[in-house]
Amino acid sequence: AHPILFERLQRNPHCPEVIVVDPRATETAMAATLHLPVAPKSDQVLLYGIARALIARGAVDPAFVRDHTSGYDEFASFVDAFDMDLVSAATGVEVALIDRAADAIAAGERVSFWWTMGVNQGHAATRTAQAVIALALMTGSIGRPGTGANSITGQCNAMGSRLFSNTASMFAGRDATDPAQREAVAEILGIDVAAIPDRPSMAYDQIVDGIESGTIRGLWIIATNPAHSWIDQQRFNGLLDELDLLVVQDLYSDTETARRSDLFLPAAGWGEKDGTFINSERRVGRVRAASEPPGQARPEFETFKGLAEDWGCGPMFRRWRDRSRGHGRGWSCRVR
């Protein structure tokens, strides 16, 4: 699923140890030095058990924990209940294999933790991701080359959306509540800092709550079908009628959400629009349209720019081609 990253692993001259946690014997698992075939939905228990084992091995970085974390004592007390016998029974993984994984992490000078949609869109996703991050933090495996808690995106150009304003108001790595960071982004974009909100946009659950409370009266849904594919479908579907206006912008007009819309905006498909995407090497790839979009369909960004012109903020979009030049200013890993 992520050939660029895995090929980097294969080319590593230091022959790193690769531990794969997956119920399935995938190609990645078969190429790993250690495969932990956990039972579905048991990742969280495994991670807590490994955390307990690392504490027992003295593999915690006390200076890093002291200077850069909070709540470690509470976490250590919590995972103390996850002994190897309990973890093995819950995960179906032999104690010896779990011990091998803990030993490898404890002995590693540079340990990197990677996960993708199997965690982020799986059972107890938030807690499982937090458990992975906790392993990186408690061992000090973060902030140095070859380390890190790395959540790898799952869909094409999902990384692009994160780098360029996944919070709808700031570039990635910036804090919307920090005036200095808002000033920096405004300078890069060449716009008035007052145009940048001082708070992040709303998450899905907050949007649903906003519809229910009446705070949100109109909703514009782009390239997704929450009436079918998102969590708590029954609640969301029941709230759609509470909106004064539902706009759906999508390639398909017959999705469950599109059929409920007051206004449908037909979008161009991937082969019908120019654009770019960003891959795991931070390279920006150029995409050119193979054909014209049919009928009234148009690229999403053209719709956004048109609306911006009508709202009087069109000039803020006219320098969009130069955004990437300043996006990574001050970063050690610039987008190329």
Residue ranges and their predicted role:
Residues S169:
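Expand to "…catalyze enediolate/carbanion chemistry for C-C bond making/breaking, isomerization
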Residues A1-N157, L163-F164, Q181-R336:
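Cofactor-pocket helix-loop regions in the catalytic cores of large enzyme subunits
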